[in-house]
Amino acid sequence: EAAARRELIEETGWSARELRFLVEGPMSTGASTEIIRTYLCTGLEHVGKSGGDDNEIIEVIEVPIRDVHEYLVNAQAGGVLVDLKVFGLVELARRALAR
């Protein structure tokens, strides 16, 4: 969880009051043994600039959770490559928020 908090700030410029574990699994089944853990972050506060390391290009886009699926579909239609895992993780986040 400490690594997730650190990465959230470094990559997005936001910190979270609460991190709720969602799921963990291999980054790429059969191709890698790297395991990723995902969290739902709530109680967000902007604490600095986003961007990650010097060799990373990160753009933070704020989209209400109710609009994320449509946003991703439109991004794909516009030629953006969206990792398919993102669609599943958005649904897990929606379900967790509904509980």
Which residues fall in each region the model found?
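Nudix hydrolase/Nudix homology domain
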Residues: 21, 29-32, 37, 55-99
